[in-house]
Every structure is written in structure tokens, then in C-alpha cells.
Amino acid sequence: ASSLSYGCFAHDRGTAVLFGDGAAGILVQNDGSDSQILGENLSTFGEAGMSLTAGHHAGQNPFGENHDQDDQFLQMDGHAVYNFATKRVPESIEQAVKAAGIELSDIKYFVMHQANERIVKRVAKKLSLSMNKFPVNIHNYGNTAAASEPILLAELAEQGRLHRGDYLALTGFGGGLTVGTIVIKY
């Protein structure tokens, strides 16, 4: 589950209108099939971490420094996050696919974090791939943060679009700034 609405300042049009709450669950079991994790990539870019922060809240150290009222909410530099995502997400995907020992063209779907449809389209273009391989559901739910990939994966399964043996790349990115991709054989 991911709940970002609690951390957004209601009058901040740069965050409050973008983030929503969502939850999804995926059951993973050993069913005797050859489904497996084939490759992964995880990268952090702390030097740009202030571009997307969760803000300070009651769950943090109560004995720490006093914080300004302004820094208690999620804050985002949308332009910086867009530039980060459109540069680093394709790199992460390429590295994970290479680690998996397959080609980009072997991937049936790239299940990306649903932060922004423009980011998804730009990543597809940078990888020279059709948007048909990049399902999008942000128009239904908004940005549900960490829940967006499992929600999209569950929808693909429910729609009968996934079959045993399909190669999938699941990619998330966000605060920190961080990006991660895992390539699986479904």
C-alpha cells in the first residue's frame, strides 16, 4: 500500500493534485514453472535527492532539529524529477535487460511506475520501442507511488494479457533519487 495524500499540502498544486493512494498485492509461489527473476538494476543518485522529498513528519526523530513548518510536506521539483526519470530509467532498463541475458525486443511489457504518462512515452522513445509495450493506467488512478507497478501488473493479469514465459521489466523510480528495474520470466 502507498499513501502519499497524507504528506501533501492541500494547496500545493505541484504535489497535491498529482499524488494519490493505492494498494495492490501479488502472490508469489513456487508452482514448478520456470518463472524466475532474470536480472536487476538498482541505482541511487543522492546528489539530486532534494528534488523529491517526503518532508518531515511525526514519525521522524522527535529529538532532532526543529523543522520549519514549510518542510513538513512532500516537496518536488517536477522538472528535475522528469529529467532524472527520462535519463536514468532507460539506463536502468538497459542494464537489467543486459543482466538478464536477453534483448529489449524480448520484453513483452515494460511495467513502469505510473508517475507521469509523458515520462513513460519519453522512456519508450529513448529505447526506440513502441508504446504498445508500455501499458499505462495513470489516467484511472493518478500517481499511486509505489503501488502503481503492482496495480498495473494485476490489471494486465486480470485482462489475460500475461502468459507463462512472458518476459517483463518492472521499473520504479522516485525519492532519493532512486531507480530500480527487475526483469522476470512470468
Locations of regions flagged by a protein language model:
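Short, solvent-exposed loop/turn segments at secondary-structure junctions
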Residues: 5-10
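Condensing-enzyme catalytic core mediating Claisen C-C bond formation in acyl metabolism
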Residues: 11-83, 87, 91, 173, ...
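Claisen-condensing/thiolase-fold acyl-transfer catalytic domains that form or cleave C-C bonds
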Residues: 90, 108-186
